[in-house]
Amino acid sequence: MSKAKNVEEFIAAQRAAIAANPDCGNSHYNLAVALIGLQKYDEAEKALKEAIHCSPTLAEAYVQLGGICLQRGDLDGCLAYNQQAIQSRAGFAEGWGNIGFVQLQKGEIDKAIEALEKATKWNPNFIQAYATLANAYLMKGMVDKSIDVNLKVLQLEPSFALAHNNLAIAYLEKGEYEMAAEHCAKAVELGYEVAPEILKEVDEHKK
Protein backbone atom coordinates (compact mmCIF):
# COMPACT_ATOMS: atom_id res chain seq x y z
CA MET A 1 0.00 0.00 0.00
CA SER A 2 1.40 3.42 -0.99
CA LYS A 3 2.20 6.09 1.57
CA ALA A 4 -0.27 8.48 -0.10
CA LYS A 5 -3.05 5.91 0.19
CA ASN A 6 -2.21 5.37 3.85
CA VAL A 7 -2.49 9.12 4.47
CA GLU A 8 -5.81 9.36 2.66
CA GLU A 9 -7.15 6.43 4.69
CA PHE A 10 -5.94 8.08 7.90
CA ILE A 11 -7.69 11.32 6.91
CA ALA A 12 -10.89 9.41 6.17
CA ALA A 13 -10.66 7.72 9.57
CA GLN A 14 -10.23 11.06 11.35
CA ARG A 15 -13.19 12.56 9.48
CA ALA A 16 -15.28 9.55 10.53
CA ALA A 17 -14.15 10.00 14.15
CA ILE A 18 -15.11 13.68 14.00
CA ALA A 19 -18.51 12.82 12.55
CA ALA A 20 -19.06 10.42 15.45
CA ASN A 21 -17.73 12.84 18.07
CA PRO A 22 -17.42 16.45 16.82
CA ASP A 23 -16.09 17.64 20.19
CA CYS A 24 -12.93 15.51 20.13
CA GLY A 25 -10.06 17.97 19.80
CA ASN A 26 -7.50 15.25 19.14
CA SER A 27 -9.36 14.02 16.06
CA HIS A 28 -9.45 17.54 14.60
CA TYR A 29 -5.75 17.93 15.44
CA ASN A 30 -4.76 14.61 13.88
CA LEU A 31 -6.71 15.50 10.75
CA ALA A 32 -4.91 18.84 10.56
CA VAL A 33 -1.45 17.28 10.86
CA ALA A 34 -2.25 14.88 8.02
CA LEU A 35 -3.54 17.75 5.87
CA ILE A 36 -0.36 19.74 6.55
CA GLY A 37 1.60 16.75 5.30
CA LEU A 38 -0.33 17.08 2.03
CA GLN A 39 0.27 20.87 2.03
CA LYS A 40 -3.46 21.53 2.32
CA TYR A 41 -2.88 24.46 4.63
CA ASP A 42 -6.29 26.15 4.42
CA GLU A 43 -8.09 22.94 5.37
CA ALA A 44 -5.52 22.26 8.08
CA GLU A 45 -5.99 25.74 9.53
CA LYS A 46 -9.72 25.18 9.80
CA ALA A 47 -9.20 21.79 11.50
CA LEU A 48 -6.70 23.27 13.97
CA LYS A 49 -9.10 26.03 14.95
CA GLU A 50 -11.76 23.38 15.54
CA ALA A 51 -9.24 21.45 17.68
CA ILE A 52 -8.62 24.54 19.80
CA HIS A 53 -12.34 25.23 20.07
CA CYS A 54 -12.76 21.71 21.50
CA SER A 55 -9.52 21.66 23.52
CA PRO A 56 -8.33 25.22 24.33
CA THR A 57 -5.20 23.93 26.12
CA LEU A 58 -3.97 21.86 23.15
CA ALA A 59 -0.65 23.70 22.85
CA GLU A 60 0.49 21.67 19.84
CA ALA A 61 -2.43 23.04 17.81
CA TYR A 62 -1.28 26.63 18.38
CA VAL A 63 2.24 25.62 17.31
CA GLN A 64 0.92 24.06 14.10
CA LEU A 65 -1.09 27.21 13.36
CA GLY A 66 2.10 29.17 13.90
CA GLY A 67 3.83 26.89 11.42
CA ILE A 68 1.16 27.61 8.81
CA CYS A 69 1.67 31.34 9.39
CA LEU A 70 5.41 30.87 8.90
CA GLN A 71 4.74 28.98 5.68
CA ARG A 72 2.84 32.07 4.49
CA GLY A 73 5.60 34.44 5.58
CA ASP A 74 3.52 35.82 8.46
CA LEU A 75 6.05 36.19 11.29
CA ASP A 76 3.69 38.17 13.53
CA GLY A 77 0.98 35.52 13.20
CA CYS A 78 3.48 32.78 13.99
CA LEU A 79 4.66 34.70 17.05
CA ALA A 80 1.11 35.27 18.29
CA TYR A 81 0.11 31.62 18.02
CA ASN A 82 3.24 30.42 19.81
CA GLN A 83 2.62 32.95 22.58
CA GLN A 84 -0.83 31.38 22.95
CA ALA A 85 0.86 27.96 23.06
CA ILE A 86 3.04 28.87 26.05
CA GLN A 87 0.05 30.45 27.78
CA SER A 88 -1.98 27.28 27.33
CA ARG A 89 0.77 25.05 28.73
CA ALA A 90 3.43 26.17 31.18
CA GLY A 91 6.96 25.10 30.33
CA PHE A 92 6.14 24.26 26.70
CA ALA A 93 9.64 24.25 25.23
CA GLU A 94 8.61 24.05 21.57
CA GLY A 95 6.55 27.21 21.88
CA TRP A 96 9.44 29.10 23.48
CA GLY A 97 11.81 27.81 20.80
CA ASN A 98 9.55 29.02 18.01
CA ILE A 99 9.13 32.40 19.69
CA GLY A 100 12.90 32.75 19.87
CA PHE A 101 13.29 31.76 16.22
CA VAL A 102 10.73 34.34 15.05
CA GLN A 103 12.19 37.09 17.24
CA LEU A 104 15.62 36.38 15.78
CA GLN A 105 14.15 36.64 12.27
CA LYS A 106 12.68 40.01 13.29
CA GLY A 107 16.07 41.21 14.56
CA GLU A 108 14.96 41.22 18.21
CA ILE A 109 18.10 39.48 19.42
CA ASP A 110 17.79 40.09 23.18
CA LYS A 111 14.19 38.85 23.21
CA ALA A 112 15.20 35.85 21.11
CA ILE A 113 17.97 34.92 23.54
CA GLU A 114 15.59 35.16 26.50
CA ALA A 115 13.01 32.90 24.81
CA LEU A 116 15.57 30.37 23.59
CA GLU A 117 17.19 30.14 27.01
CA LYS A 118 13.75 29.28 28.39
CA ALA A 119 13.24 26.68 25.65
CA THR A 120 16.48 24.92 26.54
CA LYS A 121 15.71 25.19 30.25
CA TRP A 122 12.39 23.39 29.78
CA ASN A 123 13.90 20.84 27.37
CA PRO A 124 17.65 20.31 27.91
CA ASN A 125 17.78 18.10 24.79
CA PHE A 126 16.16 20.62 22.42
CA ILE A 127 18.86 20.60 19.74
CA GLN A 128 17.27 23.07 17.33
CA ALA A 129 16.69 25.61 20.12
CA TYR A 130 20.35 25.32 21.19
CA ALA A 131 21.47 25.83 17.58
CA THR A 132 19.29 28.93 17.20
CA LEU A 133 20.48 30.22 20.59
CA ALA A 134 24.10 29.77 19.53
CA ASN A 135 23.38 31.81 16.41
CA ALA A 136 21.71 34.52 18.49
CA TYR A 137 24.73 34.71 20.80
CA LEU A 138 27.00 35.04 17.76
CA MET A 139 24.85 37.85 16.34
CA LYS A 140 25.09 39.58 19.72
CA GLY A 141 28.89 39.30 19.68
CA MET A 142 28.92 36.76 22.52
CA VAL A 143 31.32 34.47 20.68
CA ASP A 144 32.45 32.33 23.62
CA LYS A 145 28.85 31.64 24.65
CA SER A 146 28.03 30.72 21.06
CA ILE A 147 30.91 28.25 21.01
CA ASP A 148 29.85 26.70 24.32
CA VAL A 149 26.28 26.18 23.10
CA ASN A 150 27.37 24.73 19.76
CA LEU A 151 29.62 22.28 21.58
CA LYS A 152 26.60 21.34 23.71
CA VAL A 153 24.69 20.63 20.49
CA LEU A 154 27.48 18.32 19.31
CA GLN A 155 27.39 16.46 22.62
CA LEU A 156 23.72 15.76 21.94
CA GLU A 157 24.12 15.10 18.21
CA PRO A 158 27.72 14.76 16.91
CA SER A 159 26.59 14.76 13.27
CA PHE A 160 24.63 18.04 13.49
CA ALA A 161 26.31 19.81 10.58
CA LEU A 162 24.94 23.29 11.32
CA ALA A 163 26.75 23.33 14.68
CA HIS A 164 30.06 22.53 12.95
CA ASN A 165 29.42 25.33 10.46
CA ASN A 166 28.61 27.81 13.23
CA LEU A 167 31.68 26.76 15.20
CA ALA A 168 33.81 27.42 12.12
CA ILE A 169 32.40 30.95 11.95
CA ALA A 170 32.87 31.56 15.68
CA TYR A 171 36.45 30.29 15.70
CA LEU A 172 37.26 32.49 12.69
CA GLU A 173 36.03 35.48 14.68
CA LYS A 174 38.33 34.50 17.55
CA GLY A 175 41.28 33.97 15.19
CA GLU A 176 41.49 30.27 16.08
CA TYR A 177 42.02 29.18 12.50
CA GLU A 178 42.93 25.54 13.04
CA MET A 179 39.73 24.94 14.98
CA ALA A 180 37.78 26.84 12.33
CA ALA A 181 39.27 24.66 9.59
CA GLU A 182 38.50 21.48 11.53
CA HIS A 183 34.83 22.31 12.01
CA CYS A 184 34.47 23.69 8.49
CA ALA A 185 35.80 20.42 7.07
CA LYS A 186 33.43 18.43 9.28
CA ALA A 187 30.44 20.50 8.16
CA VAL A 188 31.34 19.88 4.51
CA GLU A 189 31.87 16.17 5.20
CA LEU A 190 28.37 16.00 6.69
CA GLY A 191 26.89 17.59 3.58
CA TYR A 192 26.41 21.16 4.81
CA GLU A 193 26.72 23.88 2.17
CA VAL A 194 29.26 26.17 3.84
CA ALA A 195 29.18 29.74 2.53
CA PRO A 196 31.90 30.41 -0.09
CA GLU A 197 33.29 33.34 1.90
CA ILE A 198 33.79 31.09 4.94
CA LEU A 199 35.54 28.44 2.85
CA LYS A 200 37.76 31.15 1.34
CA GLU A 201 38.67 32.64 4.72
CA VAL A 202 39.47 29.21 6.17
CA ASP A 203 41.62 28.40 3.13
CA GLU A 204 43.51 31.70 3.39
CA HIS A 205 44.62 30.88 6.94
CA LYS A 206 45.77 27.33 6.29
CA LYS A 207 49.46 26.83 6.93
Predicted ranges, named:
Residues 2, 169-173, 193-207:
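TPR/TPR-like alpha-solenoid helical repeat scaffolds
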Residues 2-16, 38-50, 71-84, 105-118, ...:
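Structural signature of tandem alpha-helical TPR/SEL1-like repeats
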Residues 25-26, 59-60, 93-94, 127-128, ...:
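Helix-start (N-cap) detector for alpha-helical repeat units in TPR-like alpha-solenoids
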Residues 26-37, 60-67, 71:
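Non-membrane alpha-helical segments in proteins
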Residues 125-189, 193:
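Ankyrin-repeat and related helical/solenoid repeat scaffolds used for protein-protein interactions
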